[in-house]
Amino acid sequence: MKVHATVGNEAIALVYIVETSSGHLVECVESVQPPLPSEKKWVLLVSTMFGCPIGCLMCDAGGYYHGKPTKDEIFSQIDFLVGKRFPDGEIPCEQFKIQFARMGEPSLNLQVLDVLQELPRRYRAPGLMPSISTIAPAGAERFFDPLLEIKQEEYAGGHFQFQVSLHTTDIALRDQFIPVKKWSFAQIGDYGERFYTPGDRKITLNFALAQGMPVDPMVLLNFFDPDKFLIKITPLNPTYRARENNLVSYVNHLSAEQ
């Protein structure tokens, strides 16, 4: 794997632009969560697509789409990041999170399922916790149904994080923000009821909240059981696409870090 660029601060996060075996460029990231040292929590973010076809209003990855990495190309990102810190493949971190959330919509690449099945046997990592972040596109049942089985077989007892990006409870604004066909709140809630079992982490409903994008708790309560779902509100990153679309974060980045 060829590294084309590295940006960031090792004390917080490093972003790598790398070239895969097929000649495509992707981003992958390693990060920590101060004040926790990496021995406590180490987080990797890997790309599941070359760009992204979704076109969310705030996401720079939607500017182009050139296909899907194979299982080996996804693993090459993880192997690269792991090899820099733990070349023997033994990862002693209390929490070793791998987020399939850098570039691309993971549910549109079935190779991600193969990666999830193999992960527990590829590294010696007792703290392993994969994390899938999705917009829940329509027609992705052939990903989500086997994902439920893989979670039960390989990651039961709170070793898996499932996150759905909603961004607002206003349906019309959600359709503008995420301009593709996707599951309704009712469909997401129904899947969550099947996905969650006692001992699991709660399913995260993520809101990268922009000004003017409402979050109505009563709407959420109509579809999502608070015993099985939680709400996460994060700052909207100041991307090129966000600026083009005049999106301003509702949450101040500096206050969110404190």
Where are these regions (language model features)?
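Short secondary-structure boundary segments
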Residues: 4-10, 15, 74-77, 99, ...
